Amino acid sequence: MAGLQRSTISFRRQGSSGIVWDDRLIAELSQQAANDRKGETLQQDEQAKLITSEVQDQTTKPIAGEGLKPIRTDGGMERSRSNGGGAIRHHRNTGRVSPAVDPPSPRLSAFGCCSAFGKKQPGKKVNQRKRPAKRRSR
């Protein structure tokens, strides 16, 4: 039994979804993802170098339009968090909504024997037999 070896080509795994995964395919996908991450970091490093060099170039060059006034971009109305300012929202804001509350269960007696064993409501008094009023002697 010690002489048996697993073939790297024919070995497969079956996932929880029932899809059969080939280990070779999984290895290729993980290598490709790692290479993509390395490529992205190299591109980000190059972009950062370009941006820093552009900033250095701009500081040494004179600005062509020094006499121009800046464009005023503020609107006539300022917004605070309470009237819709702040974070960008892509949904309709309807205000605060209270959480859903389950309605109380109905108090129904289905059968006589079931109502005999049921709990009494705390607000209701037990019906007692009315006794006749005591007569006063004259």
From Swiss-Prot:
Residues 121-138 have a biased composition (Basic residues). This is MAPK kinase substrate protein At1g80180. GO terms for biological process: stomatal complex patterning. The modification Phosphoserine is found at residues 98, 105. Keywords: Developmental protein, Phosphoprotein. Expressed in developing cotyledons, mature cotyledons, cotyledon epidermis and stomata. Residues 69-81 have a biased composition (Basic and acidic residues). GO terms for cellular component: nucleus; plasma membrane. It comes from the Eukaryota. Residues 52-138 are annotated as: Disordered. InterPro entries: DUF4666. May play a role in the regulation of stomata patterning. Disulfide bonds: none annotated. It comes from Arabidopsis thaliana. The keyword Calcium does not apply.
